[in-house]
Amino acid sequence: MAFDAAMSTHEDLLATIRYVRDRTGDPNAWQTGLTPTEVTAVVTSTTRSEQLDAILRKIRQRHSNLYYPAPPDREQGDAARAIADAEAALAHQNSATAQLDLQVVSAILNAHLKTVEGGESLHELQQEIEAAVRIRSDLDTPAGARDFQRFLIGKLKDIREVVATASLDAASKSALMAAWTSLYDASKGDRGDADDRGPASVGSGGAPARGAGQQPELPTRAEPDCLLDSLLLEDPGLLADDLQVPGGTSAAIPSASSTPSLPNLGGATMPGGGATPALVPGVSAPGGLPLSGLLRGVGDEPELTDFDERGQEVRDPADYEHSNEPDERRADDREGADEDAGLGKSESPPQAPTTVTLPNGETVTAASPQLAAAIKAAASGTPIADAFQQQGIAIPLPGTAVANPVDPARISAGDVGVFTATPLPLALAKLFWTARFNTSQPCEGQTF
């Protein structure tokens, strides 16, 4: 009987050790608070049952929070009330801003941990969100929802830290990552503020009118955050098919066999890749943003810099060197120039722009049917190099020096990136081609 009691006590002790290990994620957590002699006694088969009983009680007392956790009613009740308050206030508005606010709040307050690892950062974030919801009385107004979204955007780094470090269950991690992605996409360019301000009038109130030689100002977002951009690299599972692109469109990931080699992959400069895009002329950016060097060298249209502020053509001083020549000779020169111009126009007639619909529903405009066909083929899974070559469009080979780099804020689908640093994983191909990050900028910093 004494032998059976000792075996039963030893089995209970082993079960307790396994329980503490599984709940904490630390295989040595059960040793906390034990002396070296007690640790040795646990792994010794000849230890008496009385001593094992004392060690067992000591382990359970040390980890009493795992056996007798504090009642979660208060915390869960606060979170439920905060979600209910936010839902009641934001439900008064049928706007994308209000829906995104509610998505982020629900994902944060409903997140659960598998183990205690990383729990402090999650609990702190949840308390801050609960407090923010309680003290706000204007969530039922469009201005209040936008202001609350700016508060949530300020928590992007905290949300990223929770996703990267906390031991979340699968459902919580997926929901929180989807909310983070939507919120991060909304933060780029501060589109909410741009919509509030509306189009700026030329030459009015505080902003001088631009001269003809100046480029139009483009909306820019804050300085790029390498840690934010690199979060997607930390867990390839976050790029699964169930992750929805903000706006309700699901982005399709090309299969590994059809994924083009990364140095020839068209699209925006992706974080962590160090790419310098080379210009493929003739593609207009979604939303009407002009590309650097658009249509440069195509057709006979003069450069914008060839006109002064009144729209008059500016001639080179050398054009006036022969102004004193006889009228007959100048007339002959003009006739020859007209014949050359007519010949050039007859040999290369201008081609009408063509609209291309991408698999995710977005549309881009190409300057020629050939470029449109290349973009459509590449978006359907054809390797980038093959898609462009089939249309007779040459693109730079890997390692080619970029003669006309495009400003990162002005790149679009159809530009070709020539990589000069660490290649990107193939899982990012869908984000690269669909221009999810078409305003990202190359940067250096910590990666996950």
UniProtKB/Swiss-Prot annotation:
Residues 187-198, 307-334 have a biased composition (Basic and acidic residues). Residues 187-221, 243-270, 291-361 are annotated as: Disordered. Coiled coil: none annotated. Residues 243-261 have a biased composition (Low complexity). InterPro entries: DUF4226 (IPR019710). Pfam families: DUF4226. To M.tuberculosis Rv0025 and Rv0739. This is Uncharacterized protein Rv0026.
